[in-house]
Amino acid sequence: MLNIDQQGLVVDKRVIKAISPAIERGPMNVVSGLIVHQTGGATAQSSLDSYKRVAANGAHFLIDKDGTIYQTASVKKQAWHIGKLKSRCMLEARCSVARKKLNAKFNPSLENKREMKKSAPDRFPSNKDAIGIELVGEALPRGAAIPNLPKLRARIHQHCF
């Protein structure tokens, strides 16, 4: 069980409090999702430092490569870690004809405004209702080639079976 105090902070000795007021925005009254990101940076400290900048963006939690968990914002406050929302019905191929026409022209700002009029789960979670978790690092180093999956599977199979 996760214990959360009145201020929205996790009460657990394994979670290091590193609250950055610059990333806390308005109140978050309901949580409809968890969004996991990768920082793209090499260290937790680089993210923690960036969270101190004026009008910084960041997530509620930061998990370092060694597993250290930092809480960087209250779970009772919004943290801006999500960009403009894309149309969920378009991505899931279930939009009405009228909605498809609205989304036919590429306009991220208008698409975001339309999506924000919806409630979750009819739209993706947003900054106003999602807890953000950032993992230090990136999926592949910048410039690295995307692995050939069939070849990778064959190598794994060869070594494991």
Describe the predicted segments one by one.
Residues 2-161:
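Active-site-adjacent loop/helix surface patches within enzyme catalytic domains
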